[in-house]
Amino acid sequence: MEHDERTHVPVELRAAGVVLLNERGDILLVQEKGIPGHPEKAGLWHIPSGAVEDGENPQDAAVREACEETGLRVRPVKFLGAYLGRFPDGVLILRHVWLAEPEPGQTLAPAFTDEIAEASFVSREDFAQLYAAGQIRMYQTKLFYADALREKGFPALPV
C-alpha cells in the first residue's frame, strides 16, 4: 500500500501532561471550569496538561503545565505514551503524557485560573467512582494511571 498525504491525520493541536502519584499511589487531578468554546469540560477531572506552544518541546510543555496548574515543579521520569483525541468541535489533538515526580520539599499550591477550579490527589477508589460517573474527561487518563501504578509498584485500580 502506498502512503501519501491522504493516509495521514492532520493534527490541529498538540498537548502534553503528566501523571503524578503521591506516596499512597493517589493521582493528582485538576478539575476544569471549562473554557470558552468548550463548556462540556466544566466540572470534569483530568491530569495536569495543556497546549504545547509553538517551538516548545512536548516534555517541556508537560513540566510547564504541571507547574502552572498545581504549583509543583516536576521531573519527568518515564514517557507513558501519546494518543489522539477529538474535541466535540472536531479539533484533533495529539497529547503526550509522562510519569513525573515532584521536586522535593514542595506542597500542592494550585493556581486557580479561568480554566482550573481545583487540584487534588485522588485515591484509586475515588478515581474508579469518578470514572464510573463520567467525571474523568478522557478515558486515556485511566489507562495512563493504570500504567503509572504498575510502573511504581502500586496495586491496580479497582474494577
Curated annotation (Swiss-Prot):
Record: residues binding Mg(2+) 1: M1, S49, R95
This protein's record includes keyword Hydrolase: yes
Key words of the record: ATP-binding, Hydrolase, Magnesium, Metal-binding, Nucleotide-binding
Catalytic activity: 8-oxo-dGTP + H2O = 8-oxo-dGDP + phosphate + H(+); 8-oxo-GTP + H2O = 8-oxo-GDP + phosphate + H(+); P(1),P(4)-bis(5'-adenosyl) tetraphosphate + H2O = AMP + ATP + 2 H(+)
EC numbers, comma separated: 3.6.1.61, 3.6.1.69
Record: residues binding Mg(2+) 3: R14
InterPro entries named among the record's database cross-references: Nud_hyd_Dein, Nudix_hydrolase, NUDIX_hydrolase-like_dom_sf, NUDIX_hydrolase_CS, NUDIX_hydrolase_dom
Pfam families (alphabetical): NUDIX (PF00293)
Superkingdom of origin: Bacteria
Cofactor note: Binds 3 Mg(2+) ions per subunit.
Signal peptide positions (record): none
PROSITE patterns: NUDIX, NUDIX_BOX
Domain (Nudix hydrolase): residue spans on this chain: 11-144
UniProt-annotated binding residues for ATP: M1, E2, H3, D4, E5, R6, G50, A51, F87, P88, D89
Binding site for Mg(2+) 2: E53, E65
Cofactor field: Mg(2+)
Short motif (Nudix box): ranges: 50-71
Gene Ontology MF terms: ATP binding; hydrolase activity; metal ion binding
Family as reported in the entry's similarity comment: Belongs to the Nudix hydrolase family.
Subunit structure: Homodimer.
Role noted for this protein: Hydrolase that can act as a nucleoside triphosphatase and a dinucleoside polyphosphate pyrophosphatase. The best substrates are 8-oxo-dGTP and 8-oxo-GTP. Other substrates include Ap4A, dGTP and GTP. May be involved in protection from damage caused by radiation.
Annotated NCBIfam families: Nud_hyd_Dein
Protein name per UniProt: Nudix hydrolase DR_1025
Lineage: Bacteria, Thermotogati, Deinococcota, Deinococci, Deinococcales
